[in-house]
Amino acid sequence: MTTVREIIQSPLFARQKKKLHKQQIKDLDRAIKFIFSAPTLGDMKVGDLQGIRIYKFKSNSQQILLAYEVVESTLFLYAFGSHENFYRELKKYLGGV
């Protein structure tokens, strides 16, 4: 099991987080703490998003998807959002990275 020592958020993740309300930020931070303590918690994706994990959590009774990747001891937070167009936008963003 990998021990995470550092968290890096993508510019997209930072922009998305700025738009949230206080309660949504608390829910997101709680989800990040879960991932930090157990990096293999999310579902591993295949195909174009191979290596990316998706963790699902609730915020204001809406399901939110959080895309992340663990490389060695670093947790990379890529994006989060509702299921609508999430994978398409994530694939487009990661293709440009």
Regions found by a protein language model. Give the residues of each.
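Enriched for short, Lys/Arg-rich terminal
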Residues: 2-6, 59-65, 69-97
